[in-house]
Amino acid sequence: MADLAQLEEQIVGLSLLDAAELVKKLESRLGVSAAAAAPVMVAGGGGAAAAAPVEEKTEFTVVLTAAGANKINVIKAVREVTSLGLKEAKDLVDGAPKTVKEGVSKDEAATIQKKFQEAGATVEVK
């Protein structure tokens, strides 16, 4: 066991050029090719990478980016969505870009976005 630990330390201490030379010597002596194993790993990694984008985001943030020309309707929409008071809703609209709601479902985010767009505001769902 001590021999393996010592061998490991020696291999880890090799420079890249020495490690590449060691690989070539081991390939010829053992009759294997390290290059043949690499595509298998890449193909497996590619499958895992392709599976990751399939996961859908479950929580969204709705951000009011611009109030538009009809601020009154936008303030009303903010009050409906957030149940804020009149002053707080006005401050939110005047301070755009501001987060209107966080951690909402995809359907709720789409509903909120539609409501704000109908009121004349520009909204971004993140």
From Swiss-Prot:
Keywords: Ribonucleoprotein, Ribosomal protein. One of its GO terms (molecular function) is mRNA binding. One of its GO terms (biological process) is translation. SUPFAM superfamilies: ClpS-like, Ribosomal protein L7/12, oligomerisation (N-terminal) domain. Belongs to the bacterial ribosomal protein bL12 family. Forms part of the ribosomal stalk which helps the ribosome interact with GTP-bound translation factors. Is thus essential for accurate translation. This is Large ribosomal subunit protein bL12. It comes from Koribacter versatilis (strain Ellin345). The gene is rplL.
